[in-house]
């Protein structure tokens, strides 16, 4: 699915945002 791809993208985006904040 497509849901799997979206989940991966969401996790990556959150990771990048968290890194930027930290």
From Swiss-Prot:
SUPFAM superfamilies: YajQ-like (SSF89963). This is 23 kDa basic protein. It comes from the Bacteria.
